[in-house]
Amino acid sequence: MLAVMMTVALAACGSASATKMTMGTGGTGGTYYGYGGVLGQYIKNKAGIDVTVVSTDGSKANIQGIAAGDYQLGTVQSDVMAYGWEGSRSFEKDGKVDSFRVVAGLYAESVQLVTMDPEIKTVADLKGKSVSIGAPASGVYFNAIDVLNAAGLSESDIKAQYQSFADSADALKDGKIDAAFIVAGAPTPAITELTTTNDAYLVPIDGAVAESLMASCPFYTTYVIPAGTYKGQTEDVTTITVKATLIVSASASEDDVYKLTAAIFDNVDAITAENAKGAELSIENATSGMTVPFHAGAAKYFAEKGVNVATE
């Protein structure tokens, strides 16, 4: 199940009794994995917690992995986190999961619609096209369905393909699909690689489509991907986002979660130097828009910074 493992181990001279945690992230072609590795490094170096970062199938797998005790930390989409807590949508069959808590919101996860087909200028142009919409019941899948529905389309109006970010990029290059939904922090490695050697571009998700989405679902907000984010991108692209969120097992100790929260937010500049998404780390962003309770350890840290968050 775990395709790739990145161990952020304590040095040999470190304490043998250090807390050990495994962090579930996402595919290696997305932002979660690389960013998770950076966070794991700072949690190890500054909090003394031995973190192993693993590549997974993403948000739902990370929530279920924490529930099963396989992971203690995970990066998730804010909307999928809410589905797990409520037992809705992607968790409707499996049931609700309440064995996790929020550490912090991390960064905007852009819903990126990428194509190499010059005929595709709007979401409506996807009708009849072969489109990758993520794994069934994944966060990406539901984001894609929401966008399609807001544009007056359904899953049956497209030739749906269910692929990972990396597989979607390869399929676009090989002409096997016409477009792909990729939900991740921009720049996303899979899209960066694709645009480096191919004439690919992002399709805006704006206007009436974005307005409909935001009116029907509180998780979505508008976001602008700046010109120059990807090779050949000469203009800003407006889209929608959800929020990448770090969660932790509810059973983790208050002291450990306090220390790992401090390790992240006391080192924002250094983290940003290693991964550009670190620039979005802030107390305000970390604590706003969360629909699931915070862990007491994270709440303690944010309270010291003047922000009180709900823990139940």
Residue spans for each PLM region:
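Short, low-complexity disordered leader/linker segments with a strong preference
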Residues: M1-M21, T311-E312
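Bilobed "Venus flytrap"/periplasmic-binding protein-like clamshell domains
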Residues: K20-K46, D50-T52, A108-D174, S288, ...
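Pocket-flanking alpha-helical
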Residues: G36-Q41, V54-K93, L113-E119, A166-A171, ...
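N-terminal secretory/targeting leader peptides
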Residues: K46-S55, A61, D70, N198-D199, ...
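Pocket-lining segment of extracytoplasmic ligand-binding domains
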Residues: S78-V80, G87-F91, E155-L246, A252
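Short beta-strand-centered segments that line the small-molecule binding cleft or hinge
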Residues: A82-G87, S99-G105
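Ligand-binding clefts/hinges and TM-proximal coupling segments of bilobed small-molecule sensing domains
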Residues: S130, P136-D146, F219-M290
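An extracytoplasmic/periplasmic, membrane-proximal ligand-sensing/linker region
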Residues: Q163, D167, D174, A184-P204, ...
